Amino acid sequence: MSKKLFLSLFTLVIVNFIFAENKIISVDAKANISLLNGSISEYVFDPDSHNTDDVLSRLDWDVKNVPIVSVSVDLTLFKYAYFNLGAGFGFPSTPSGNMQDYDWLNCSDFGFPEQYGTELTNYSIHDNFLNSYRNFFVKFGFNCYLPLNITVTPFVAYNYEYLGFDSFDGYTAYKVDNWQKDEELSGNVISYFQETNAFLVGIKLISPVLFNFKIDGEFFISPYATNINSLDKHYMRQIHFIDLMPRSYQLQSNLNLSYSIHKHHKVFVQGFLQYIPVSKGNDYIRETDENGNYTSTNWTIIKSVQGGTSRFLWQISLGYCFSI
């Protein structure tokens, strides 16, 4: 009985703090749905390549109108301490444009004439589908209150992201055949997965505008504090590749416009940008059998080449916020 009484009193105290005029705790609970767009590129760099920047191969994975559902909670403690926790999830098997594979096999190892120079030698295109997407975010900051009801919040953040794509069917074409369709492909050709762990610093600005509208923006930077691991599965070649790209650089930004229907209810539209310039790292290889089972014990580093990636993604969201 005493435990129940204590829990009841504790709950009443917390509720009183939340709903009091001078709040100790303020909560914004948000839910939104968005469409994710952009592209992610995968690279192979070979110092023997005659192509620009030593690019031997590039795979462009479309991110096209991929629906994402996200939830987040903003907590403000004692008016100044700021905490944010959020997560987002995608829907597997969602169509996502194409995957296009470009090769510049103009170095002596592949036997192509040197006069090809920077010209493309091989090309293929495939239907692209989302395999998986999940995103987790946590932020800690400190609110600074300025005149005109403007709030500035510097913060530190951690972001975990995992996404993957499957490419199916399509065809290949080659320069030596004057780019005629050479081979029709069927089934799963290549799958690609990226796992990203990032530590970021940023700043958030909130400002009221006309009527019941409010605008807030965030800018993040990860100064070579993003770790990217990628896995590339070539099913037809029965080969898997891993690229390890520590100390990568990235930028993110959000812009949010909200409208207060009631003091506890808001609707909002939000835009998001993410940019990761070309990042490079060690490339590892491992062979498989026709069923995808590994035929070798360990991953072997390919000392003659490097793997790499880059991305530019943007997102438009519509959402609802409940404030207490």
Q: What annotation goes with each model-predicted range?
A:
Residues 89-93, 137, 141-142, 151-153:
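Acidic, polar low-complexity intrinsically disordered regions
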Residues 1-26, 323-324:
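Cleavable N-terminal export/targeting peptides
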Residues 70-84, 88-93, 97, 101:
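Post-signal peptide N-terminal segment of secreted/secretory-pathway proteins
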Residues 38-66, 91-135, 161-196, 222-254, ...:
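Extracellular/periplasm-exposed beta-strand and loop segments of Gram-negative cell-envelope proteins
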Residues 32-34:
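Short, structured protein-protein interaction patches enriched in aromatics and acidic/basic residues
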Residues 204-210, 214, 224-226:
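Short helix-capping and hinge/turn segments at secondary-structure transitions, especially at repeat
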Residues 21-29, 67, 79-85, 148-154, ...:
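Outer-envelope beta-barrel architecture signal
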Residues 71-75, 136-144, 156-160, 201-207, ...:
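Residues on the lipid-exposed face of transmembrane beta-strands in outer-membrane beta-barrel proteins
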